[in-house]
From Swiss-Prot:
It comes from the Eukaryota. This is Pentatricopeptide repeat-containing protein At4g20740. It holds the Pfam family PPR_1. It comes from Arabidopsis thaliana (Mouse-ear cress). Residues 59-70 have a biased composition (Basic and acidic residues). Keywords: Repeat. Belongs to the PPR family. P subfamily. PPR repeats lie at residues 157-191, 192-226, 227-261, 262-296, 297-331, 332-366, 367-401, 402-436, 437-471, 506-540, 541-575, 576-606, 612-646, 647-681.
Length: 727
């Protein structure tokens, strides 16, 4: 019997309404999601903006400017917070609670974290794995893993161990991850092959070849035999990281286990043998591959050729090419291109051109890069006509020459004195809306100077200025290029004198010319440029003063060189290594031992990689504390083994060390041994012995004066009429 209906209720049956999920956020009602971090979502108030006509602002496409080698910028990766929030939405509530407990305590394990976790009735292995997959702190992850394992009746499963291994590797603790198999075994869950595979894959992806072999050895100790796939992974990691002998040892184990090679196995070995240059063994492996499995395909042969070309072994790559033809494998464009580029870079442009003609005969699409490499090869061989013919072929094939091809042909034309044609090509490059650089213009500029067409050279400079290129930078690079050839130094000076009248002088150009004249031995002319630079109002920089230091030392004016060194220090700059070497040499010649050692220490303190003789000078000083001639000679022997020349600085270091810590007798023993070995001449021995005596006298006098001042005897000596202290 139906119960009576309550009063005041409509006849229509009640239908309950359930709200599923979060409400839709609006401008006034944000929605808060719980998770790793509070995610307060609200819709911002967007001011209405007039829609612009996108077609009006779109840049028209110009096929002439299109370059197939350019790529669109990759899409920006999602931010870290986005990744974390997305991952937290997939977490179970308990895993989210655990991660929130870590976050509240700033990822520091302690009693507060343990008290939070103890609120949970139980943490299952799946929860442990879920938490460790997002863990970014190895210490907290290890503590949590250990805490979970102490639960009553709890036992980690394979997923938890695997997640722990990934967490340790992700945070750089891969050595600790390698100990997980022992941990699993001690906790009553022996590892399976999968755990070792994970460790091997992690090390292989991070290019840790020796670690891969270490895990492989551990795998054998646990009694596991890898499958073919895992063997391939191990050998590939060892080959890629340069441990080919270990890869061969693993291959021997592979054969002892009675496994059958796959094509991947053969290719790993072949590529390793190619890298090691063991071509005969590689050909034997290829023959076994043909007999036992199948012939290598075009991709396998291309990989071999690419490996050999990258190692610079072109003879072996041609042998592999012959093997490919013997197997009746048709090369593709990648195989042709790899070999042609390698041959041209190795100077075998004729052989590369033969392969190029084969490609044309087979109607294979030829890349512009192949044209460019062939043109550069012909220019390097002096076959400019062939390079120009190839350019015509390039244009007929529908390509537009890039700036690299222009640079190569311009350089070739200038080498055969066709500088006018080269200049026309430069103008064509500008009309084609390319961007010529110094590499384009330098052959033209040098050719005009060599042919003594200085007016045309000036016109080129004006054209450079009109195009908006930095004339001063181009001139600096030009003089560097010209002064690199000693025969063209005189031409460089002639050009400079003309440019100077047109206001194109600069400190950098003066420095280049000063250094060139110094290397030629024309010290006076180099210094005259230095004085001229100052007279014209240019402020010398540290390089200018460094070159002047070298010049003054060669001239014999060490005092002036020292004054320039002080100016460099006042500028808060560092002299060049050449200036340090030159100044120490000059100070050695006038017997300023302390100043030499001071400069040695200053140089090694200021310069990133100082001269080896300076480093050994400090070593000699340190060894002299033992006052043992044999120890000093051991350092000298080490210098000879390292190929370091024993010069004045080392002699000064011996004098400085022995005058402070040793005796004159021990120093003479060292000099006598150096003379016996014909390292030091008899005249040098006499000079340095005198320096040794003088330096010892100085140090003895310094000790006496220090003692007088320490005991307060100065006033008594002056009262008795002693005037030595005044001097």
């Amino acid at each position: 019997m139906k119960s009576p209906k309550p009063p005041n209720l409509s006849d229509k049956s009640l239908k309950p309404n359930f709200f599923h999920g979060h409400r839709k956020p609006s401008q006034n009602r944000p929605t808060v999601y719980g998770g790793l971090f509070s995610n307060r979502q609200s819709i911002p108030r967007v001011s209405p903006q007039p829609q612009s006509n996108s077609l009006a602002h779109r840049t028209p496409f110009d096929l002439r400017k299109w370059d197939p080698e350019t790529h669109l910028p990759p899409p920006s990766p999602p931010s870290h917070s986005t990744v974390i929030s997305a991952a937290s939405e997939r977490l179970s509530p308990i895993a989210r609670f655990v991660l929130d407990a870590f976050r509240k305590n700033r990822n520091h394990w302690g009693p507060s974290v343990v008290s939070e976790l103890n609120k949970l009735r139980r943490v299952t292995p799946s929860i442990v794995a879920e938490v460790l997959k997002l863990g970014n702190d190895a210490a907290v992850a290890a503590k949590f893993f250990h805490w979970a394992g102490k639960q009553k009746g709890y036992k980690h499963d394979f997923a938890a161990y695997n997640a722990f291994a990934y967490c340790l590797n992700r945070n750089g603790h891969f050595r600790a991850a390698d100990q997980l198999p022992e941990l699993m075994d001690s906790q009553g869950r022996p590892p399976s092959e999968k755990q070792f595979e994970i460790l091997i894959r992690m090390h292989a992806d991070n290019r840790r070849g020796l670690r891969v072999y270490y895990v492989y050895e551990k795998m054998k100790k646990f009694g596991f035999k890898p499958r073919v796939f895992l063997y391939n992974r191990i050998m590939d990691a060892l080959v890629k990281n340069g441990y080919f002998d270990l890869a061969l040892a693993v291959y021997e184990d592979f054969k002892e286990d009675g496994l059958v090679e796959e094509s991947t196995t053969f290719m790993i070995l072949v590529k390793g043998l190619c890298k090691a240059g063991r071509i005969e063994e590689m050909l034997e492996i290829l023959q076994r591959m043909r007999e036992n499995l199948c012939k290598p395909d075009v991709f396998a042969y291309t990989a071999m050729i690419k490996t050999l070309v990258s190692e610079g072994n072109l003879d072996a790559s041609l042998r592999v090419w012959d093997e490919m033809r013997r197997d009746e494998i048709k090369p593709d464009v990648m195989a042709y291109g790899t070999l042609v580029v390698g041959l041209c870079k190795d100077g075998r442009v004729e052989r590369g051109y033969e392969l190029f003609m084969e490609m044309k005969g087979k109607q294979i699409l030829i890349d512009r890069e192949i044209y460019r490499v062939l043109i550069e090869g012909f220019v390097a061989d002096g076959k400019v006509r062939s390079a120009c013919n190839l350019w015509e072929d390039l244009v007929d094939s529908g390509y537009i020459a890039d700036i690299g091809i222009y640079n190569a042909v311009i350089k070739g034309l200038c080498s055969v004195n066709q500088v006018d044609k080269a200049y026309k090509l430069f103008q064509v490059a500008i009309e084609e809306e390319l961007e010529p650089d110094f590499e384009t213009l330098s052959p033209i500029m040098v050719a005009y100077v060599v042919m003594n067409r200085l007016s045309d050279f000036s016109n080129v400079l004006e054209r450079i200025g009109e195009l908006g290129y930095p004339v001063s930078d181009y001139l600096t690079q030009f003089f560097k290029l010209l002064c690199a050839d000693e025969e063209k130094n005189a031409m460089a000076l002639d050009v400079f004198y003309i440019l100077k009248t047109k206001g194109h002088g600069s400190v950098s150009v003066y420095n280049i010319l000063m250094e060139a004249l110094y290397k030629m031995g024309d010290i006076q002319k180099s210094l005259s440029l230095f004085y001229e630079m100052r007279k014209l109002g240019f402020e010398p920089d540290s390089s200018s003063y460094s070159i002047a230091i070298c010049c003054f030392v060669e001239k014999g004016d060490v005092k002036a060189a020292c004054s320039f060194h002080e100016k460099i220090i006042e500028m808060s700059c560092v002299p060049s290594i050449a200036a340090y070497l030159s100044l120490t040499k000059g100070l050695c010649q006038i017997g300023e031992i302390d100043a030499v050692m001071l400069l040695v220490r200053e140089c090694l303190g200021n310069v990133e990689s100082g001269p080896m003789e300076f480093k050994y000078a400090l070593t000699v000083c340190h060894v002299c504390k033992g006052s043992n001639a044999e120890k000093v000679m051991k350092v000298v022997d080490e210098m000879n083994q390292e190929g370091v020349f024993i010069n004045e600085v080392i002699y000064c270091a011996i004098i400085s060390g022995m005058s402070k810590h040793g005796t004159i007798k021990v120093a003479r023993e060292v000099f006598t041994e150096l003379k016996k070995r014909k390292v030091m001449t008899e005249a040098d021995m006499v000079v340095y012995e005198e320096m040794l005596i003088e330096q010892t006298k100085k140090k003895t006098a310094d000790l006496v004066l220090s003692g007088i001042k320490f005991f307060g005897l100065e006033s008594k000596l002056r009262a008795k009429g002693c005037r030595l202290l005044d001097n």
